[in-house]
Amino acid sequence: MASANSSAGIRWSRQETRTLLSILGEAEYIQRLQTVHHNADVYQAVSKRMQQEGFRRTERQCRSKFKVLKALYLKAYVAHATSMGEPPHCPFYDTLDQLLRNQIVTDPDNLMEDAAWAKHCDQNLVASDAPGEEGTGILKSKRTQAADHQPILKTVKASDEDCQLRISDRIRETSDLEDSWDESSGAGCSQGTPSYSSSHSLFRGAVAPCQSSPMARLGVSGEPSPCTSTNRSTPGVASTPQTPVSSSRAGFVSGGDRPLTSEPPPRWARRRRRSVARTIAAELAENRRLARELSKREEEKLDRLIAIGEEASAQQDTANELRRDAVIAVRRLATAVEEATGAFQLGLEKLLQRLISNTKS
């Protein structure tokens, strides 16, 4: 067991922190912390358990320390989940992960709001103090600063979703572009030169697709097919014999309508595809850069919030010490006044007895 005269100041030793987490890790406490919003009685019970273990820690100190650890864990968890650089250092990460992982799955919004824990912590401290007590005006400026900050990780989550949507839209556009080119390259049956346009479809065939039967497409029938000639005979004009198309160019894939060989795409189509690919790569790089910058900014904001919370907790501890010293001084003064009053009454009684005895004599 740790020393009984442990410091009740600002710094927490590793043994104290480990003891606090082991107490909060019990099923009774962690369930009450997740289900009860006003949990002052929970931290009172935790403070009593800490005193039984030999550490003098008040309810507010236990609450503030757990809030700081939760904010550090949430920062490291988000950095690890989004893979934005190296995750920040978080002491007791494994223990906190066992305590808070279930809360992330069941109630993520409540845990994300703990990123701005300083504001809520100060409000709980003010609500728990009786009106008229000393030391409540010390944290007014810190509450104003903490109130200006919004929940940090909601912003990170929204920006990450926006980046993912933009990336998926670009990938979908590229996929549609490739599909339209593939369909257009294999749709026409004629060997004539296709007419190209700048519409959403890369190019359209000059001749309508062949509507022959599957047997004709497979080349089983010996009859001539419209797809094997470049033009049709016109009435009144002698038709010239057409040379049969080689099997390498007329053959089709079994089970499909696309020919085995197709003409390569034109140069402008290749240039356009390369330009689209370069644009997508540049936008992806820009999105990654913006996401890294946003992550750094949010980490800085969270660090400032944690520093504000620690300073507020330190000032609250100082105010509690001053109030405790004042109460002790008032009690000592009251005891001294009572002793002086008793001595005065005793002397007065003796004086009266002497006067009475002199009068009788």
Curated annotation (Swiss-Prot):
The protein, known as: Myb/SANT-like DNA-binding domain-containing protein 7
Tree of life domain: Eukaryota
Entries under Gene3D superfamilies matching the protein: Homeodomain-like
InterPro entries: Myb_DNA-bind_4
UniProt-annotated stretches for the region Disordered: 174-198, 217-272
Myb-like domain mapped to chain residues: 11-70
Disulfide bonds: none
Compositional bias annotation for Polar residues: 187-198, 226-249
